Design a protein with these regions (language model features):
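M16 family metallopeptidases and their MPP-like homologs
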Residues: 1-14, 18-70, 82-90, 95-124, ...
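Surface-exposed patches in mature extracellular/periplasmic domains of secreted proteins
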Residues: 38-40, 73-80, 172-175
Length: 179
C-alpha cells in the first residue's frame, strides 16, 4: 500500500472505540441495526463497506461517520494488532505457498518496488504511535473518494443522507499513488 501507516491504521480500527462507545459497544450497536462495516487497504485505495438492512442505512451512516470522526487510540489494542501482524509474518515464513506466490512472484514481477519490500520492519511495527494511526483514520474522508450504493432506496434519498452526514472538506486531497 502506498501509505504503510494507513494500511496498519485500518487494521487497528476494528479494535477501537470512540469518545462515546467502546469497541464492543460499537459492535453491539451495529448488530442492533443489522449492519456490518469492513475497512480494507488495497494497493492504492482504502475500501470501506457498510452493509446490512436498508431500513438502517441512515443510522448506519451516522454511526460510521461517528466512528471515523471520534475514534480513540488504544495502546493495548495496538500492541495486540502488532503481535498479530508479527505472528502472521512468522506463519507466512513456514508456508511454501506464501513464499512462492506472496514473495517470489511479487518480487519477480515488481523487483525493488515489490509490495513485499514495502512493509514495516519489526522495529517499526513495535514503535508505531497509536495517536498517529488514529489521526490517519480521522483523515480518511479528506481524500478523493467515491461512494457506491447498492440497494432498494432511491438514489436521491441516499444523496440526501450523504450530504447530511458524510463530512468532507471542500477540497479533497489526491490519493497517494502506490510505489
Amino acid at each position: 500500500f502506498s501509505d504503510k501507516e494507513m494500511a496498519m491504521a485500518v487494521e487497528y480500527l476494528e479494535y477501537l472505540g470512540t469518545d462515546q462507545f467502546s469497541a464492543n459497544e460499537l459492535q453491539l450497536e451495529l448488530f442492533k441495526l443489522g449492519l456490518n462495516y469492513d475497512v480494507y487497504a488495497a494497493s492504492e485505495r482504502v475500501y470501506i463497506t457498510l452493509s446490512g438492512l436498508d431500513e438502517s442505512i441512515e443510522n448506519g451512516i451516522q454511526l460510521f461517520e461517528h466512528i471515523i470522526s471520534n475514534v480513540q487510540p488504544n495502546e493495548i489494542a495496538l500492541k495486540n494488532t502488532v503481535l498479530d501482524k508479527l505472528k502472521e509474518r512468522e506463519d507466512a515464513k513456514l508456508s511454501k505457498r506464501s513464499i512462492l506466490y506472496g514473495g517470489l512472484l511479487n518480487y519477480g514481477m515488481y523487483g525493488e518496488n515489490s509490495p513485499i519490500k514495502h512493509k514495516f520492519s519489526k522495529e517499526e511495527l513495535i514503535n508505531l504511535n497509536p495517536d498517529s494511526l488514529v489521526w490517519k483514520i480521522k483523515k480518511l474522508s479528506s481524500y478523493d473518494h467515491y461512494v457506491y450504493y447498492y440497494g432498494r432506496k432511491d438514489i436521491e434519498e441516499i444523496k440526501t443522507l450523504l450530504n447530511k452526514y458524510h463530512q468532507t472538506p471542500e477540497n479533497l486531497k489526491p490519493i497517494i499513488p502506490a510505489k
